[in-house]
């Protein structure tokens, strides 16, 4: 599935939109996100999107390992140069987690953390308010829906670096809001690694 790997050399380092030469895109220059670096490994299109749906909506947890393997095959170049004090899967609200029975980002993160020897931030450290599923909303609705959705319930070490893991990166509004909340609570650099993102217009 290497043909679905996103070429970082031709992507904005902050939103992974296609940009010749890998420069920061105009949108991110105008309004930089709260996180410091972003990476998405694959394009969200068949068969990758079908594999993610099997994990996320059909509760096929066996799909988490091959998907994590694909992430590692196209991993961020900055993994070798940056230090992470904690790794955190994108939190789900209590209501959504109970309904689904698991957190798909957590399933991926557990595999990656063992592979790279990372320390997981405890699940109870971050609370997420329940709201409408982001995938059902338009861009401006996503920003309103996710505003003030997170609350840090644990004391973070001052200036700690955190790596966020998510399954699908679309507009980045959820990761941006979480990064903003973490930094307000004392975190240092925030890095984001997403399994996939939809293809963007060049």
Describe the function of each predicted region.
Residues 1-202:
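Glycine-rich phosphate/pyrophosphate-handling loop used in enzymes and phosphotransfer proteins
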